[in-house]
Amino acid sequence: MNANIMTSGQFPDLLRVGIREVFLSEYQMYPELYSKVYDVQTSNRAYEEELIIAGFGAIPEWNSDGSELPTDRALTGNRVLYVHKDYGMMWTVSKRLLREDLYAKIGGELMREAVRAMKHTVELVAWSVIANGFTGTRPLFGNQTLLNGESFSNAISVALTPTGLEQALTRFHRWRNHRGIPVVIEPKQLIVPPELKYVAYTLLHSTYYPNIGSGGNTAPSSTGSAFYDNPFKNVVPDTLCVPYLQDTNDWFLFAAPKVHKLRFYWREKPATDMFTDFRTKGVMHSITGAFSVGFTDFYGVLGSQVS
């Protein structure tokens, strides 16, 4: 017998007369998180391709008394490919389970569990790009080389404290494009693991200056800090608590999804299918999907890796 086929023996309680409901493991699922951070688009090709382009720099002074206009050209960087990957699984319910009318009781729950598994997979893959963004041959966070040859760092290594948040906000206000021109870019989201959720809330919503040390202590201060207004109050509109961030100290400051360059492409949104297996007379189910995720440029995202 195929070990992957669910049989009536796995659900002995269902054979009892009078059973009315079957409950699988129920848990409170987090709402969809990845779409709050990524620019989510739909693709109709095998892959998507994007190119980093820098426009013009400062316009030079020109002698209009018969001299030619100075020339400039756009700068281009590397092409970034988003190659879609397929994800899927199947499961089979035996004929006996169907015949005893047991499947009618658990079929819907099994399908919901499969949908939850797919949702979990999407979140896991999407957040791994951010969580692992400090490492690799092309890191998302670090000392980045601009197309004009200069450099700009979108990474810091400070705990989520007033000092750390101030440093991150200052870095945002010092943002330069690939031509070295200062650009106005506002932080939209403070992204934290569950361990920093209340630290983030204290920083952004307390009325008075937050007393938060490097260890995340939010106890009232005896130094008189409560007499100062909180300069960080509502500076960052949204706080996002993400359980897929495994490091309990790292945190991130992002611009709005339409501003930065993190991409999520749906090639095939999750879909389910079912048919009868003529060999076993059981019912086979499947769930599949295809997508790609990554980043084109580091613009508009900042990460703090705390050792």
How would you describe each model-predicted region?
Residues M1-Q28:
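N-terminal alpha-helical "arm" segments
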Residues N2-F11, L146-R174, E186-Q189, E195-S307:
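Sequence/fold signature of self-assembling virion shell proteins
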Residues L24-Y87:
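Assembly/oligomerization interface modules of large self-assembling protein complexes
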Residues Q28, E32, S43, E123-W127, ...:
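Intrinsically disordered or highly flexible coil/loop and linker segments, enriched in small
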Residues R73-V83, Q167-R179:
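Structured alpha-helical segments in the cores of large, soluble enzyme domains
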Residues T76-G77, K85-Y87, R179, V184-P187, ...:
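Short, well-ordered loop/turn elements at secondary-structure boundaries
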Residues R79-G136, L190, H285-I287:
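Long, contiguous amphipathic alpha-helices that act as assembly "spine/axial" helices in icosahedral shell
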Residues W91, G136-L147:
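Conserved binding/catalytic microenvironments
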